[in-house]
Amino acid sequence: MFAKADTIPNTEKLFENSNGIAIWGTIGKHLGFVTNIRDSREWGTRQYPGVINFSREGLGFAQGGPDYLEHDETVAYLVANWNHLTLQFGKDKNQWGPGRFGQLALSTRPTSYDQIKLQYATDRLRFTFLLAQLQHYNDHTYFYGARKSKILVGHRLEIAPFSRLTFSFYEMMVHAGNNIEWAYLNPVMFFRSADHYLGDRDNAGMGGDFTARLPLSSRIYGEVLIDDISTRRLGSGFYANRYAWLIGMDMADVFKMQNFDLCMEYTRIRPFTYSHERDIDYRHFTTNLGHWLGPNSDLIALKMTYQVSQPMIIQMTFGRLRHGDNPLNANIGGNILQPWGVNGQPTNVEFLEGVLKKADLVTCMIKYEPLRNFNLRAEYVYSRDTIAELTRNELTLFFCVNP
């Protein structure tokens, strides 16, 4: 991969080389396996941390120097199925939620993590129980001996009462340490009640989403995540009202143009959402498990996708992002690393309070597969900070051979 980013003060060049191996298959009628190992090295004129061991957004453990970094990504798991039951054990990612630009509960942005996942599925119902081990870091640096682990446990119930309508409800719990409480191993336990029973020591969250299929090959969808909430002060700026929601709509074959798809989505995340006052915030390494926007932010986005032919796809994305950042020596909930009580303790925080940042985003991507499993991709990203009046242009050229 080759990338070139042009900013106001300078121009930087970035190169990345990835290689690996992927093996998958089945053993008998009920057992399957996947092993996908990829090792990557990135270098260029970009400024790197200059430390041997560290972590970065979207990555796990990384190593590097002043002008490069190296990291690997591994997905490896066994899966067994019998009638309506599926059991998966290994290292993988998860996606909970219908969002097209990001998911509030679990997204695929963090690196993969070790997990056990049990699913029961029928035509109208699917139940998922997830138990996973996460890695915790207080910042983007890493030192030997400073590693901490935490446990993620969650369950999700999806119901389709009608062929065109699906509802889902879920709970998540982050628990410190390597040992899991027995109460969280109960798939039908209400985790928030279990947390109260155990002394309110863990980080609980819950939510739901829906998808409704409409005529003209379209659908609407939405999701709500409740990190914490005070029903008596609902609708106010009370700091403990930590929640997020998104709403979207997508359409296929828009304007009767075959293979031309359109998607519109709005996401809104309250201050302090995803953060926690102990080492059980909602992150794996240094990456948010949920939406990449982070707290005290919103995004409105439009995506157009046109499949010109079988091997060629053109995609354009337009978006406007707003974020309320923490002022110096104050905490208004704009940083997942700073929970309530750090740098002051405001009891009332309005949405987008703080140092307001706005950005306009435009992305154009062309993907072409001239030969089977040989992919070419060119991507151009334009972003403009409307407050600071800074512009960034980024061009990425990607070459990939997949088995």
Residue spans for each PLM region:
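Exposed, low-structure sequence patches enriched in small/polar residues
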Residues: 71, 161-173, 178-403
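Outer-membrane beta-barrel channel domains
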Residues: 1-166, 177, 234-243, 250-268, ...
